[in-house]
Amino acid sequence: MSFGHDRSRRQGRRPPFRAPKKRILIVCEGENTERQYLEGFAKYHRDTLVDVKVADEHGVPMTVVRDAKRLKKEAANAARREGDRNLKFDAVWCVFDRDDHPHVPEALTMAANNNMEVALSNPCFELWLLLHLKASPGMLHRHAALSMLKKLVADYDKSVNHTDYHAGYEQAVKRAKRLDELAKVANEPG
């Protein structure tokens, strides 16, 4: 007769394996609109760990990319130091507007050279929000995009509740791809 637990039975049981969640860093230029939308998007899609940071200097694409590069490197160093590869980011995204920034091509190149993705809003993030609600008539100036958004969202003032836009996400993606194709024909960044 054996008292206690059956050792062979205990060794055969393993705790269920759960793959670590993907860790994504998003660095954006906007203090309110972009950050609020992206944080809401991250909460809605709970399958990843998304860390949204606002660039140190708002509104400058090169600063967004430099901050993302620095944060990516800090996470990689922490992962190496702690011996925990899950501290590294699986993906790094830089989110900025085209607006009238003169150094967008350099920012795109720096991001690509550092294995970072870019979500470029051309001309501005408000166009992305607008695409959730209706099709764009084509290439717009940022002031026109903002004006159209304010007509559709009466209380819009550089502040976003993601749930107001979630239902239109799939349509926004399709509409953005169409605009991207038009931009390529016009030889503009998408």
Task: Identify the meaning behind each predicted range.
Residues 54-82:
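A broadly used, surface-exposed interaction patch
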Residues 29-31:
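Helix N-cap/beta->alpha junction signal
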Residues 2-4, 9-25, 35, 39-56, ...:
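C-terminal accessory helical subdomains adjacent to catalytic cores in phosphodiester-
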